[in-house]
Amino acid sequence: MGRGGAGVVKFNLVDRIEHLSDERIVAVKYVSLAEEYLADHFPTFPVLPGVMMLESLTQAAAWLLHKRTDFACSMAVLKEARNVKYGTFVAPGGALRVEVELNKTTDTGATFKAVGTVGDGNGNGSSAVALQARIELAYFNLGDKQPALAELDRQLREHNRRRWAVLRAQSAEVAV
C-alpha cells in the first residue's frame, strides 16, 4: 500500500487539525496543483478526485479513533461508506474542511457522520458542501488473527504516533 509497506498511507489527506474532542474532529486538506493525481483528474480542469475526498474523511475519522484509544490498534480502514453525496469541486488553491462526528463504537470499529466543505473563494466565510457520507471504519491489529504479525502492529502503531506528532505540531495553536 504505497512505498512505505503494508498499512502505510501513501497520500496524507489531512494537513491540519482545527478541533479534536472525544466525539468530533475537524481537519483540513489543502489542495495543491503539485499533487500528482491532479495531472490526470482532469488535465484541463484539475479537481480533487471524489475518492480522495472520501479518503480525507476516512483519515480524519481514523485519527479520531487513534486518539480516543491512545493508538491501541495499528489499522483503521474504511469498511463501508453509505449515503455518499458529492456537491461542489475542490480545486487547487482550495481547502477541503472535514468535520467528522462519532456516531457509534463497537468492539471492531466505529461509525461516523462526515461532511467536507469548501469555501466559496469570496472571503465572506460561506462554504459549500463538497461531500457528505456515513462511514464505518474497522479498527484492529493484524496480530489478532495472525500472531506472527504482532511486531508489524507495534511498528505501525509507532509510525502512526510519529505521523500524529508531526500533524499535531502543524496544528499547534489548536488544542489537540
Walk through the language-model features, giving the residues of each.
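Short, hydrophobic/aromatic-enriched beta-strand segments in well-ordered soluble domains
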Residues: 29, 99-102
